[in-house]
């Protein structure tokens, strides 16, 4: 976030409790300091339980000075607002682990998944932009591979799609992009997507 000069954090939405998706919790403290306010954090009960185990000092009544300061909000099975944006939580599966995908306006975001239920496909219908994980070329037990991600992109039919959660096994993005349809590209650090 520092490299991309992010100055304000309106909210932080957790998709699931794996370490590579929650370890940045400590980075909130910089936004607490600069903006002089708590950061709104959104998580399911399952993710909240994990956050409390991994970061107990954030949730203590008597906090040590300088720990991340948050307002924790529970994600339920219904839309919720973060500032002026309305988010729709969408269930997906990461092998046996429930993960929350999100839709905001015409933008849908699906990471760490290998199964999308029909209910979620219905919620994704009409998305203009889709971000979806595509770990590698070969099948994987808990992530979509490139072929599966492209099939989902075809089904959702967004005008633009980005592949995320890519491993080195997929190859260099410049090489992968050359193989993709014109409306599909690899996501990259610093990518900005504007939603309404």
Residue map of PLM features:
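Binuclear metal-ion centers of metallo-dependent hydrolases, dominated by the metallo-beta-lactamase
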Residues: 117-196
